[in-house]
């Protein structure tokens, strides 16, 4: 691996550690040219199914888009970044476990709603209002009743 400081092509791994959750490997490297040390992270490459939009277009799954949706729904709510990341990890695990090459955007939206309902009811209602295209106050009332009286 090339040194990020001097671009020397020869670096040596001086320490390797696996993350607590086993999701990645942390390596400390030392440059053979300038002797500076730097850290790299190695994680397995994972492919996700393509997302099929309502109009039939197929787009690549983008974690950043999902994160953006969570952040909008949970803006100014008492939900930590760690909680959001954990919710996204659960969704990504479900997507991987589907074993399918494509997934409907509506199915992904339902996964997001399930996670938001567990994290924060207000965030859930905010997301539902856009996702389900609320048109009037009755739509909000119906979802609020659903949140108050699950089952």
From Swiss-Prot:
Cofactor(s) named in the record: Zn(2+)
Keywords: ATP-binding, DNA-binding, Metal-binding, Nucleotide-binding, Repressor, Transcription, Transcription regulation, Zinc, Zinc-finger
Cofactor binding note: Binds 1 zinc ion.
UniProt cross-references to Pfam families, sorted A to Z: ATP-cone, Zn_ribbon_NrdR
Zinc finger (unnamed): 3-34
InterPro entries named in the record: ATP-cone_dom, NrdR-like_N, RNR_NrdR-like
Provenance organism: Delftia acidovorans (strain DSM 14801 / SPH-1)
GO MF term (any one): DNA binding
GO process annotations (BP): negative regulation of DNA-templated transcription
Known function: Negatively regulates transcription of bacterial ribonucleotide reductase nrd genes and operons by binding to NrdR-boxes.
Stored PANTHER family: TRANSCRIPTIONAL REPRESSOR NRDR (PTHR30455:SF2)
This protein's name: Transcriptional repressor NrdR
Family according to the record: Belongs to the NrdR family.
Top-level taxon of the source organism: Bacteria
Residue ranges occupied by any ATP-cone domain in the UniProt entry: 49-139
Regions annotated as coiled coil: none
């Amino acid at each position: 691996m090339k040194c990020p400081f001097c671009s020397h092509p020869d670096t040596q791994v001086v320490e390797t550690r696996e993350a607590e959750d086993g999701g990645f490997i942390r390596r400390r490297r030392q440059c053979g040219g300038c002797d500076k040390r730097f850290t790299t992270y190695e994680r397995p490459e994972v492919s996700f199914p393509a997302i099929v939009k309502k109009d039939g277009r197929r787009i690549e799954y983008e974690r950043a888009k999902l994160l953006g949706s969570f952040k909008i729904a949970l803006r100014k709510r008492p939900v930590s970044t760690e909680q959001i990341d954990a919710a996204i990890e659960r969704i990504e695990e479900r997507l991987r476990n589907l074993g399918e090459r494509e997934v409907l955007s509506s199915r992904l939206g339902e996964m997001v709603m399930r996670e938001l309902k567990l994290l924060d009811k207000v965030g859930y209602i905010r997301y539902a209002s856009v996702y389900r295209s609320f048109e009037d106050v009755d739509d909000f009332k119906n979802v609020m009743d659903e949140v108050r009286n699950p089952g």
